[in-house]
Amino acid sequence: MQKIETFWYFCLKHFKQELNGQQFNTWIKPLKLEICPDVENTLVLIAPNRFVLQWIKDNFVNRIDEMAQGHFNEKIHFKLELKDPAEIKTATIKAPEPKSKEDKKPPTDKAHGTTARKTNPSRLNPAFTFDAFVTGKANQLARAGAIQVAERPGIAYNPLFIYGGVGLGKTHLMHAVGNYVMELDAGAKIRYVHAEKYVSDVVSAYQHKSFDKFKLYYHSLDLLLVDDVQFFSGKNRTQEEFFYAFNALIEAHKQVIITSDCYPKEISGLEERLVSRFGWGLTVAIEPPELEMRVAILLKKAFIEKIELDESTAFFIAKYIRSNVRELEGALKRVLAYSRFTGHPISLDLAKEALKDLLAIQNRQISIENIQKTVADYYKIKVADMYSKKRVRAIARPRQVAMAIAKELTQLSLPDIGEAFGGRDHTTVLHAHRKIVELRASDPGINRDYSTLIHILRG
């Protein structure tokens, strides 16, 4: 097999064109291809950890195999292996678990937590774990990145920057990393801090002339978790202190995880030197959950809370509550409260009754005409352009955005949506939706526009 280097170069080139940069750098670039010394006509695909290994196995190994059969003149077999033999050999997508029983901390007292957590200096929420986090297409990359960081803090991706709308699970993932690291090392110095609290700490240090104490604490952490960093906007002294803390931790190979409601470069009032450093590691987005994921979230929440919830009721709630996980869980609590108040078990009819006011508000506010006018005004085009046959990008792209939003926010069928856009067929609507999903993953500007329009329409 003299052409192995040529073959792997061909594979990398192919996947680089097919995937966006973030996906390619996370899943494909870390792979290595070698000839198996023990088995004839066999190539070994080496992954850096078990999560990349599982993802490649699920998504790309068959594709690579097909390309190999077309490249070589002989039948080629593939083996998947981990780079470090000491790592767990079984490819699984389960949440991280302690490496051995000896590594585990004593059982947690539910009333007080473990000895290390009685005062909870870390500010971690023990309920936010990887096991409690429901995974779907909207968040799988962010979860995979968080798990890799949890297993190799300070090494895998530093910093890890997670961005997305309110209530999508950014804080949950951040706490999950902290809880996992704490589970492995009860003595680890971990601090979760909301950006507003960090600002408050800076102000307090300024007032009491205690910056030495402030720096000693934040610069000595093993894991710093900063939530909603957009609140640093315009606060120059806070940004300066965080810049020093960030540098100190990164240089010491200590992990930093940051969340924001938008892409780092879109945070106004943030110093360029911070924006640049936020891009040193891995930046991942969390999108609003798709229908199947919303159903899974409801069923998991019901299981944890010991609530009887059948799939049809969960599907009904998930179908109409689409913005974020927080509102989804809020709707479930409302249904549960109504059930307890009336003394009737949770059912589809009860859920419809409990949520009728909420659903009426949503249905009244969002119509396809409202979507078309809002999108047209936003992009400064005519509403008539939504129905026209014009294909220039300045008109076609807003039209695709409007179709995608209509699919997400209304209950209209694809043919009905197409009819509302100048008699287009359902395949045009489906193509528009898929195109916008792709662009939101690769183009921060489109993602920002889409999120802003959703926010405007939902009021």
Swiss-Prot record:
It is found in: Cytoplasm. Residues 1-74 are annotated as: Domain I, interacts with DnaA modulators. Residues 74-122 are annotated as: Domain II. GO terms for cellular component: cytoplasm; plasma membrane. InterPro entries: AAA+_ATPase, Chromosome_initiator_DnaA, Chromosome_initiator_DnaA-like, Chromosome_initiator_DnaA_CS, DnaA_C, DnaA_dom, DnaA_N_dom, DnaA_N_sf. The keyword ATP-binding applies. One of its GO terms (molecular function) is ATP hydrolysis activity. Keywords: ATP-binding, Cytoplasm, DNA replication, DNA-binding, Lipid-binding, Nucleotide-binding. Oligomerizes as a right-handed, spiral filament on DNA at oriC. Domain I is involved in oligomerization and binding regulators, domain II is flexibile and of varying length in different bacteria, domain III forms the AAA+ region, while domain IV binds dsDNA. This is Chromosomal replication initiator protein DnaA. It comes from Nitrosomonas eutropha (strain DSM 101675 / C91 / Nm57). The gene is dnaA.
